[in-house]
């Protein structure tokens, strides 16, 4: 990931602490999985009346590995499976959204953007040097909204994490004011907290 959010479920408060620097997933692994699943998708096990398949790209930050995303989709398209409808989605911090938005729009991705409200409410969402990510994220998301307004209206949503710097009402009104959207909301993850850090974490 290119951020180091203070409350990250893989962060310093958790027993499964992982700096998320273990490298990118390899296309060879994805190809094996797609080949295996294709046999199931094209078999009697697939009882979906629409034959729709949704593939999600999640991280870490998936836009850091756009090479893999593009390779995966190109491979799926090369399989020539006209009986199946493929949909794609991703959850992103939007730090690299300006670089890749044209491709995401071309492939009609559903995008879930992580943002906790305004700049104060999003203060836990910092980069590796402790700097706020807010201005860059808003700039990138605004660029997407202005360049592809219809797509933005239909395919882009927001997820806000609730903590001591915001509230349900504050998240709602901030995202609504910034982008005209109603955000989804999630609570802080309390699973796997290091016992010695619970009291400190509880103040967030």
Q: Predicted segments — roles?
A:
Residues 71, 99-103, 170-174:
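A short acidic, amphipathic alpha-helical/loop segment
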Residues 105-111, 178-182:
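Glycine-enriched alpha-helix->loop->beta-strand junction motifs that scaffold or abut catalytic
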Residues 53-55, 88-90, 111-113, 154-160, ...:
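Hydrophobic faces of well-ordered beta-strands that scaffold small-molecule active sites
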Residues 14-15, 62-64, 94-98, 110-131, ...:
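Conserved radical SAM core fold
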Residues 1-7, 133, 137:
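Active-site cores of enzymes that catalyze phosphoryl transfer or operate on phosphate-rich substrates
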Residues 125-138, 142, 146-204:
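Radical SAM enzyme [4Fe-4S]-AdoMet core and its adjacent flexible, acidic
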Residues 51, 84-86, 107, 151-154:
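A short helix-to-beta-strand connector/capping loop
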